[in-house]
Design a protein with these regions (language model features):
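Short, surface-exposed beta-strand-loop junctions and turns on beta-sheet-rich folds
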Residues: 74-76
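Short, surface-exposed coil-to-beta transition loops
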Residues: 51-54, 69, 78-84, 101
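A short hydrophobic beta-strand element
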Residues: 62-72, 81, 87
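Short beta-strand edge/turn micro-motifs at domain boundaries
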Residues: 83-101
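Flexible low-complexity loop/turn motifs enriched in small/helix-breaking residues
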Residues: 1-66
């Protein structure tokens, strides 16, 4: 059986955008926040400056780790710009790594 292969590479994030996400995680995130609230809040940060439809899917969520995937949707190209976001709490400080898939 042949499986689909894809390339994963670490993706650069502009410092001001990274800071907005990390500020949100430090101030608002806890594992008891509803998935819908979390999706809406992070999607709103993500959508700043664009009118694209954003697909957002939470893959893992606990007190010190949040992993989700995003992609942009357009009627012409379907889903594009796929990213994997990994937030990890280390020594009371949130870290963010984003991968382009």
């Amino acid at each position: 059986m042949k499986t689909k292969q894809f390339n994963v590479s670490q993706s650069r994030i502009y410092p001001d955008i990274r800071d907005k996400y990390l500020d949100y995680m430090g101030e608002r995130y806890n594992m008891f926040i509803s998935d819908d609230t979390l999706k809406n809040d992070l999607r709103e940060i993500f959508r700043k400056g664009t009118n694209k439809t954003i697909h957002f899917n939470i893959l893992e969520k606990n007190s010190d780790l949040l992993v989700f995937e995003t992609s942009e949707y357009s009627k012409l190209l379907e889903f594009t710009n796929h990213y994997l976001w990994i937030f990890r709490l280390v020594n009371d400080k949130w870290n963010l790594i984003r991968y382009r898939v």
